[in-house]
Protein backbone atom coordinates (compact mmCIF):
# COMPACT_ATOMS: atom_id res chain seq x y z
CA UNK A 1 0.00 0.00 0.00
CA UNK A 2 2.86 2.38 0.85
CA UNK A 3 4.42 1.67 -2.54
CA UNK A 4 1.17 2.53 -4.40
CA UNK A 5 0.75 5.77 -2.45
CA UNK A 6 4.39 6.62 -3.06
CA UNK A 7 4.00 6.28 -6.84
CA UNK A 8 0.73 8.24 -6.89
CA UNK A 9 2.40 11.14 -5.09
CA UNK A 10 5.47 10.92 -7.33
CA UNK A 11 3.19 11.00 -10.40
CA UNK A 12 1.60 14.17 -9.02
CA UNK A 13 5.03 15.71 -8.36
CA UNK A 14 6.38 14.89 -11.83
CA UNK A 15 3.32 15.27 -14.09
CA UNK A 16 0.79 17.58 -12.44
CA UNK A 17 2.62 19.89 -10.03
CA UNK A 18 4.87 21.52 -12.68
CA UNK A 19 1.78 22.60 -14.64
CA UNK A 20 0.15 24.17 -11.57
CA UNK A 21 3.20 26.07 -10.37
CA UNK A 22 4.33 26.58 -6.76
CA UNK A 23 1.28 26.85 -4.52
CA UNK A 24 2.28 25.33 -1.20
CA UNK A 25 2.67 27.69 1.75
CA UNK A 26 4.76 25.27 3.78
CA UNK A 27 8.26 23.83 3.72
CA UNK A 28 8.52 20.95 2.85
CA UNK A 29 5.83 21.08 0.17
CA UNK A 30 2.61 19.18 0.82
CA UNK A 31 3.53 16.42 -1.62
CA UNK A 32 6.99 15.97 -0.08
CA UNK A 33 5.41 16.04 3.39
CA UNK A 34 3.00 13.32 2.26
CA UNK A 35 5.85 11.12 1.03
CA UNK A 36 7.77 11.55 4.27
CA UNK A 37 4.66 10.93 6.40
CA UNK A 38 3.77 7.74 4.55
CA UNK A 39 7.31 6.40 4.76
CA UNK A 40 7.68 7.36 8.44
CA UNK A 41 4.26 6.39 9.81
CA UNK A 42 2.91 3.86 7.31
CA UNK A 43 -0.02 4.02 4.91
CA UNK A 44 -2.89 4.73 7.32
CA UNK A 45 -1.42 7.31 9.67
CA UNK A 46 0.75 8.81 6.91
CA UNK A 47 -2.32 9.35 4.73
CA UNK A 48 -4.17 10.93 7.66
CA UNK A 49 -1.24 13.30 8.32
CA UNK A 50 -1.06 14.17 4.60
CA UNK A 51 -4.79 14.94 4.39
CA UNK A 52 -4.58 17.06 7.54
CA UNK A 53 -1.63 18.98 6.07
CA UNK A 54 -3.32 19.60 2.69
CA UNK A 55 -6.44 20.87 4.49
CA UNK A 56 -4.29 23.41 6.38
CA UNK A 57 -2.60 24.66 3.19
CA UNK A 58 -4.84 27.50 2.01
CA UNK A 59 -4.51 31.31 1.74
CA UNK A 60 -5.91 31.88 5.25
CA UNK A 61 -3.96 29.01 6.81
CA UNK A 62 -0.52 28.89 8.29
CA UNK A 63 2.82 28.90 6.53
CA UNK A 64 6.49 28.21 7.21
CA UNK A 65 8.43 25.16 8.30
CA UNK A 66 6.15 22.24 9.19
CA UNK A 67 8.03 18.92 9.37
CA UNK A 68 6.52 15.46 9.68
CA UNK A 69 6.21 14.59 13.38
CA UNK A 70 8.62 11.88 14.49
CA UNK A 71 7.35 8.40 15.08
CA UNK A 72 6.12 8.02 18.65
CA UNK A 73 8.04 5.84 21.07
CA UNK A 74 6.01 2.82 22.09
CA UNK A 75 5.88 2.42 25.84
CA UNK A 76 5.37 -1.00 27.37
CA UNK A 77 4.06 -1.81 30.81
CA UNK A 78 6.08 -3.35 33.62
CA UNK A 79 3.98 -6.51 33.30
CA UNK A 80 5.19 -6.93 29.72
CA UNK A 81 8.77 -6.39 30.87
CA UNK A 82 8.36 -8.96 33.65
CA UNK A 83 6.93 -11.52 31.24
CA UNK A 84 9.84 -10.93 28.87
CA UNK A 85 12.38 -11.21 31.68
CA UNK A 86 11.27 -14.79 32.37
CA UNK A 87 12.92 -15.77 29.11
CA UNK A 88 16.25 -14.07 29.81
CA UNK A 89 19.06 -16.33 30.94
CA UNK A 90 21.97 -15.04 32.95
CA UNK A 91 25.27 -16.87 32.52
CA UNK A 92 26.76 -18.14 35.77
CA UNK A 93 23.56 -17.30 37.63
CA UNK A 94 24.17 -19.95 40.24
CA UNK A 95 27.62 -18.53 41.00
CA UNK A 96 26.16 -15.05 41.34
CA UNK A 97 23.51 -16.21 43.80
CA UNK A 98 25.90 -18.31 45.88
CA UNK A 99 28.61 -15.70 46.44
CA UNK A 100 29.85 -15.57 49.99
CA UNK A 101 30.48 -11.88 50.61
CA UNK A 102 32.20 -12.51 53.95
CA UNK A 103 35.34 -13.71 52.10
CA UNK A 104 35.84 -10.26 50.61
CA UNK A 105 35.96 -8.45 53.96
CA UNK A 106 39.41 -9.75 54.62
Swiss-Prot record:
GO terms for cellular component: plasma membrane. It is a peripheral membrane protein. The keyword Protease does not apply. It holds the Pfam family YidD. Belongs to the UPF0161 family. Could be involved in insertion of integral membrane proteins into the membrane. This is Putative membrane protein insertion efficiency factor. It comes from Acinetobacter baylyi (strain ATCC 33305 / BD413 / ADP1).
